[in-house]
A protein has these predicted regions:
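Short, low-complexity N-terminal intrinsically disordered segments enriched in polar/charged residues
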Residues: 1-27, 43, 75, 118-132
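Short, hydrophobic secondary-structure boundary micro-motifs
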Residues: 22-23, 32-33, 61-62, 107
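Short beta-strand edge/turn micro-motifs at domain boundaries
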Residues: 90-122
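Surface-exposed, charged secondary-structure patches
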Residues: 1, 30-31, 43-90
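A short acidic, helix-capping loop that chelates divalent metal ions and anchors anionic groups
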Residues: 31-33, 117-118
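Residue-level detector of flexible, active-site-proximal loop/helix-junction positions
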Residues: 36-38, 68, 113
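Short active-site-proximal "capping" loops at secondary-structure junctions
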Residues: 28-30, 36-39
Length: 132
């Protein structure tokens, strides 16, 4: 069931179905994007995403490997998934879902880039160059 929610998340973004996409989140959910400044409430994330959802496709991520764990209580799940994206290549999604009266809802989603260790020093140096 948790996997179906995540599949639906990606499918509704790909079809730009804004109403269903945002209904998959809890009202107090957080979306954490790839930039260090991207820690959004749902209201902030929706405002950011609105222009994307006015297109035929908001964005497309395809899950190719996913691990889901459910707490012994049965009402909290966490996951990580490897995603493919045409612009970014391989990315990673991770997060937390909670079981609500309306089914599983995403409480937190984190989108990140997996940085190969072989280039990590170079990536960190470039990030630091952008700091004031």
């Amino acid at each position: 069931e948790v996997g179906r929610v995540l599949d639906r998340l990606h499918a509704t973004a790909a079809s730009a179905d804004e109403a269903v996409y945002f209904d998959l989140f809890t009202p107090d959910a957080r979306f954490i994007g790839t930039d260090a400044t991207e820690r959004w409430t749902m209201e902030e994330f929706r405002a950011f995403a609105e222009p994307y959802f006015q297109r035929d496709t908001a964005w497309t991520y395809e899950s190719r490997d996913r691990v889901i764990d459910i707490a012994p209580s049965g009402d909290v799940a966490w996951f990580d998934e490897r995603l493919d994206n045409a612009s970014y290549g391989e990315t990673r999604g991770s997060g937390v879902l909670v079981r609500t009266d309306d089914g599983w809802k995403i409480a937190q989603y984190v989108l990140s880039f997996a940085v190969p260790n072989a280039v990590a020093d170079d990536v960190v140096a470039r990030i630091r160059q952008g700091e004031p």
